[in-house]
Amino acid sequence: MPRHSDSLLIPPNMPDYERARAEFSWAAARALLDGLPDGRGLNIAHEAVDRHAQSGRDDHVALRCIDLAGGRRDITYADLAGLTSRFANVLAGLGVAPGDRVFVLAGKIPELFVAAFGTLKARAVFAPLFAAFGPDPL
C-alpha cells in the first residue's frame, strides 16, 4: 500500500483524518444525505443504494464480488436497487413489520448484502448469523 496519497490512482475520500475529525458536525453530515422521497425520514438502504440508482449512477458497480475460484460478479446500483426492493417486498409479504428482527444465515455472498439492504428498506433490523461461530451460538 502506498504511503502517500499522491501516488494513488484514485484519491482517498478522507485524505486528512485529523482535520476531518476536528471539523466534523452532525449537521454537515446530515446535509450530505438525501433522505427519503417526500421528506419521510432517513433510511440507510436508500442512501447506500437507491439514491445512486436514481441519480445517473445506475450503471456503476455497487458491489464487486470475487468467489473462491477467482470469478468476478459485478452488481450495478440499478440491479442492487431492484434486488433489495424485491427482498423488502418478500419480507412485507411474510408479515415482517418495521422494527421486527430479520436473522440471516449466509456466507460472504452477494445475497447477504441483498438481504441486509432489503431488510433495512423494510425498516426492519438486520441480524447476520455466521456459521463460523459454530452451532452453539446459533
Segments from the language model and where they lie:
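Flexible, non-catalytic linker and terminal segments flanking ANL/adenylate-forming cores
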Residues: M1-H46, H52
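Conserved AMP-binding/adenylate-forming
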Residues: G70-I75, V90-F133
